[in-house]
A protein has these predicted regions:
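Flexible loop/hinge segments that line or gate small-molecule binding clefts
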Residues: 152-173, 285-293
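Extracytoplasmic "Venus flytrap"
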Residues: 67-88, 92, 103-109, 208-209
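C-terminal motif of bacterial Sec signal peptides marking the signal peptidase cleavage site
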Residues: 48-51
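Bacterial signal peptide processing site
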Residues: 53-55
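Hydrophobic alpha-helical segments within soluble ligand-binding/sensing domains
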Residues: 174-196, 298-318
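Hinge/cleft segment of the Venus flytrap/periplasmic-binding protein
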Residues: 312-368
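Periplasmic-binding protein-like
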Residues: 69, 125-136, 160, 251-262, ...
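An alpha-beta-alpha
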Residues: 89, 181-223, 320-343
Length: 368
């Protein structure tokens, strides 16, 4: 029997509370409902189609494995990292219709913490369950609660964008390094920028984006100005603040490297509306179509990676314990925008081997 995808947004519900196995449940209570619906529409349709069956079909002898997915607060609908994750989960679901998938899209870090804590308290069962923490924002939360709770044998955890290695073999982590790709972005900025670039970060506590900052500065070859939109996860949902500040930044800088989330509604929007705008970099996916000032994009093939991890878990019951994926892996890269190919392609191709070397050296010496 095929089962649905359940999207749970803004509600403290658990899979066991739902007793309608052939119904797709969508509880939308996010701040940006329209964008969330756009992000989930294809996913929901897929789940609805896959859940059709005949009334006389027998129930399976054993319960289906479950995957519980906790997206970053306000992340779905970003047309970037989170939506790309969703695409990977959707692909997995289309090929594994017998797996229950429950998606939580919390409105705050506090809500996410409640969902995770409640799940950890659930008793052991015969159903294999994988809980996916789909954001580096959740690393402090995971460390706190996993120090106090042991996983029952049926539970596994996958934590995104973390370098921490846990003693429990059922806790798995990975990080897609942005150092090498950001290094190549910095190389391009050096060629087209006549002023000190601005590195704009969501916050100063998230190690993956600080790694991107270090890579960009290394590629640029000298110091850059650095600004933070917030001191916590809310920096990822501060597009309106970035938009307001762009009027000043457009005067002071001719290249901005934004690792802040929601840039399409902030920085890229400004560059579309005003003729005078700095050169920019896209983030996580190819965003060159969003602004003619985007010179290239730091690419994360997170959709391919999450598909691989989920498939491996279903087939083998296990996943790699702790992995780092950089330029060498193919899961990260710097993709030059089509309109700037003649300006940067040869330069980037020539510097890519050096970027791989510097990325490896960075992790050997930085402590990350």
């Amino acid at each position: 029997k095929n089962v649905p995808i359940v999207v749970i947004s803004g509600k403290h519900l658990h899979p066991d509370h739902i007793h309608a196995p052939n119904v797709v449940i969508s509880l939308i209570s996010m701040h940006n409902t329209f964008r969330a619906i756009l992000a989930m529409t294809t996913f929901l349709v897929t789940g609805a189609l896959s859940s059709c069956n005949h009334t006389d079909e027998l129930e399976p002898e054993s319960p289906a494995p479950q995957i519980v997915f906790l997206f970053s607060p306000g992340g779905l609908g970003d047309m970037s990292y989170n939506d790309r994750i969703l695409e990977g989960v959707q692909r997995f679901k289309m090929e594994n219709g017998d797996i229950d998938i429950y998606i939580y899209s919390p409105e705050s870090l506090q809500e996410a913490e409640k969902i995770f804590a409640d799940w950890l308290e659930r008793p052991q069962s015969s159903i294999p369950v994988l809980f996916v923490l789909g954001s580096s924002d959740y690393e402090p939360m995971a460390e706190l609660y996993l120090a106090e709770h042991d996983l029952t044998p049926n539970k596994s955890i996958l934590l995104f964008e973390s370098r921490k290695q846990y003693k429990d073999e059922n806790i798995h982590t990975f990080q897609i390094s942005m150092f090498g790709a950001s290094y190549l972005a910095g190389v391009c900025a050096r060629k087209c920028s006549e002023m000190t670039p601005l590195v704009l970060l969501a916050n100063n506590t998230d190690s993956p984006i600080n790694i991107a900052k270090d890579g960009f500065i290394a590629g640029y070859g000298s110091d850059c100005d650095v600004e933070y939109l917030a001191d916590d996860w809310t920096g990822y949902v501060s597009a309106s603040l970035a938009y307001r500040k762009m009027s000043d930044w457009a005067v002071d800088y001719d290249f901005i490297f934004p690792v802040a989330g929601g840039s399409n509604a902030g920085i890229y929007r400004y560059s579309r509306e005003f003729e005078v705008s700095p050169y920019l970099a896209g983030m996580d996916i190819d965003q060159s179509s969003l602004s003619n000032r985007i010179t290239g994009s730091v690419i994360k093939h997170i959709d391919q990676l999450i598909y691989r991890y989920l498939t491996e878990w279903v087939v083998t019951g296990d996943m790699p314990e702790n992995q780092l994926y950089g330029l060498e892996s193919g899961y990260a890269d710097w993709l030059v925008a089509p309109r700037y190919v003649n300006d940067f392609s040869s330069l980037v191709n020539g510097m890519r081997p050096q970027a791989k070397i510097f990325e490896k050296e960075y992790y050997e010496t930085s402590g990350y």
